[in-house]
Amino acid sequence: MNDKTIWITGASTGIGRALAIKFAKNGWNVAASARRENLLKELEELNQDIYSFPLDVTDKEKCKEVFKKIEDKFKTIDISFFSTGTWDPGKEKEIDVEQIENVMKVNFFGTLNCIKSVEKYYRYKKSGHISIVSSIAGYRGLPNSTGYGPSKSALNNLAESLFFDFKRYGVRVSLISPGFIKT
């Protein structure tokens, strides 16, 4: 095993998957989490330094359990990269409160569940990095984004607040807001 470890949520596709591959190639232990276990297994087969930890981020207790398993396996987590997200533009042609609640549950509360699971660890460790993936959709309204945009806007505000809360413990918090990525 390597000296450095990164935990990546949303690791089965897109930015999370690409990052998992890159960090593993650079000699890091990669704890890869996502809902789709079959895609995690495919990712795991690409590099011996990628380890799958299936997770539905909307389950608070499961987030805590998965974090504990990662900590037990690697003993240290240097970076937590939370890139879980969902968007279904086909369902946003009309305001659908249930669909918006689901997007908020995954994008905002799912990320918050993961942050809560690492909070005490990083505060005690007094070092580390929490990275939150948002979107340009969090800065201005876009068509068919009645759920997605507000969920990312909430992440922006959360990251900005956590920046100050964790800074006093020597823990970095960063916000990444990419444009559209074909996944």
Locate each region found by the language model.
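Alpha-helical segment proximal to the catalytic Tyr-Lys
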Residues: 120, 164-165
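Active-site loop immediately N-terminal to the catalytic Tyr-X3-Lys motif
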Residues: 93, 140-146
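Substrate-binding pocket helix/loop in short-chain dehydrogenase/reductase
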Residues: 91-92, 96-104
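Residue(s) in the substrate-gating loop at a strand-loop-helix junction
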Residues: 135
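Active-site helix of classical SDR
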Residues: 115, 151
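Conserved glycine-rich Rossmann-like NAD(P)H-binding loop of the short-chain dehydrogenase/reductase
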Residues: 26-42
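Conserved glycine-rich cofactor-binding loop
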Residues: 12-13
